[in-house]
Amino acid sequence: MAEILVDKLKEILKEGKLYLNEPMKRHTSFKIGGPADVLAVPGSRDELINLIAYLRQEKIPFFILGNGTNLLVSEKGIRGVVVKLSSLRNVIVEGTKIIAEAGASLSYIANVALVHELTGFEFASGIPGTLGGAIVMNAGAYGSEMKDVVEKVEVLDENNNILILSNQEMKFSYRYSILQEKEWIVLRAWISLERGNYEEIKKKMEELNQRRKEKQPLDYPSAGSTFKRPPGYYAGKLIEDAGLKGYSIGGAKVSEKHSGFIINTGNATFYDVLNLIEYIQKVVKEKFGVELMPEIKIVGEK
């Protein structure tokens, strides 16, 4: 990356941080991924807005990163600038509403809700991502989704205007929102909850997290559920019924605890995971005629 660009980015990121040739495996739950040319961590909302405006003006490619919990990044890494939102994590409570920035983790928001005796967000307490990423993909668990609790979302559009989208305008559906079609960036969101009882909320969070521990391979790096649920089926059951439970390619393996997860057993490469995804898709299509679509996002130079 040209020195002049780095100097300009440093000028913009007075509170933030800048890393050159930063290995993405340090920033993804899969623990896989080569270097980002530049990793920028804006220190505030204004720094994020100014940074994005500059990158767009100079036509420098960029990629927005939350917690990296739903990503498979290639060993060749990501060209341009990876913008990590980890410092944008302010959360405030107004009555029964929580207003949270995009980089706030779902578990932290769930704990804020608990402390303020607000119910409705328990389902998200064990999802290991950030609010921004969860909204973009309408993340969900245990029968609830972001669309059930998100009242409105503030985004930065492609012309660097700030827009507020209602729940309806987000066009939420299963693992989908309108943001997947746009070059818009989540800044913050309003989460609408209900008054509840501290002990009951805590009990529900503990029960859901216990279920998660029992059923999911949390001891290994992964990116959560590998595939979206096909209509009328469960991806994990199809994979298991296809005889692929425990099947591995290199260091990538179909979890024996839950076949819907691909895990990194220690030294998996990008292509180990990619080849395993494609092999699972092929076998499930041949045996059951069902097309499995990846839920994880695949990024970087192939």
From Swiss-Prot:
<keyword id="KW-0521">NADP</keyword>
<feature type="active site">
    <location>
        <position position="175"/>
    </location>
</feature>
<feature type="active site" description="Proton donor">
    <location>
        <position position="225"/>
    </location>
</feature>
<dbReference type="InterPro" id="IPR003170">
    <property type="entry name" value="MurB"/>
</dbReference>
<dbReference type="InterPro" id="IPR011601">
    <property type="entry name" value="MurB_C"/>
</dbReference>
<keyword id="KW-0285">Flavoprotein</keyword>
<dbReference type="InterPro" id="IPR006094">
    <property type="entry name" value="Oxid_FAD_bind_N"/>
</dbReference>
<protein>
    <recommendedName>
        <fullName>UDP-N-acetylenolpyruvoylglucosamine reductase</fullName>
        <ecNumber>1.3.1.98</ecNumber>
    </recommendedName>
</protein>
<dbReference type="Pfam" id="PF01565">
    <property type="entry name" value="FAD_binding_4"/>
</dbReference>
<keyword id="KW-0573">Peptidoglycan synthesis</keyword>
<keyword id="KW-0132">Cell division</keyword>
<keyword id="KW-0560">Oxidoreductase</keyword>
<dbReference type="GO" id="GO:0051301">
    <property type="term" value="P:cell division"/>
</dbReference>
<dbReference type="GO" id="GO:0005829">
    <property type="term" value="C:cytosol"/>
</dbReference>
<dbReference type="InterPro" id="IPR036318">
    <property type="entry name" value="FAD-bd_PCMH-like_sf"/>
</dbReference>
<comment type="similarity">
    <text>Belongs to the MurB family.</text>
</comment>
<dbReference type="GO" id="GO:0008762">
    <property type="term" value="F:UDP-N-acetylmuramate dehydrogenase activity"/>
</dbReference>
<dbReference type="GO" id="GO:0071555">
    <property type="term" value="P:cell wall organization"/>
</dbReference>
<feature type="domain" description="FAD-binding PCMH-type">
    <location>
        <begin position="31"/>
        <end position="196"/>
    </location>
</feature>
<dbReference type="InterPro" id="IPR016169">
    <property type="entry name" value="FAD-bd_PCMH_sub2"/>
</dbReference>
<keyword id="KW-0274">FAD</keyword>
<keyword id="KW-0133">Cell shape</keyword>
<dbReference type="GO" id="GO:0008360">
    <property type="term" value="P:regulation of cell shape"/>
</dbReference>
<comment type="function">
    <text>Cell wall formation.</text>
</comment>
<keyword id="KW-0131">Cell cycle</keyword>
<feature type="active site">
    <location>
        <position position="295"/>
    </location>
</feature>
<keyword id="KW-0961">Cell wall biogenesis/degradation</keyword>
<dbReference type="InterPro" id="IPR036635">
    <property type="entry name" value="MurB_C_sf"/>
</dbReference>
<dbReference type="InterPro" id="IPR016167">
    <property type="entry name" value="FAD-bd_PCMH_sub1"/>
</dbReference>
<dbReference type="Pfam" id="PF02873">
    <property type="entry name" value="MurB_C"/>
</dbReference>
<dbReference type="InterPro" id="IPR016166">
    <property type="entry name" value="FAD-bd_PCMH"/>
</dbReference>
<dbReference type="GO" id="GO:0071949">
    <property type="term" value="F:FAD binding"/>
</dbReference>
<dbReference type="GO" id="GO:0009252">
    <property type="term" value="P:peptidoglycan biosynthetic process"/>
</dbReference>
<keyword id="KW-0963">Cytoplasm</keyword>
<comment type="pathway">
    <text>Cell wall biogenesis; peptidoglycan biosynthesis.</text>
</comment>
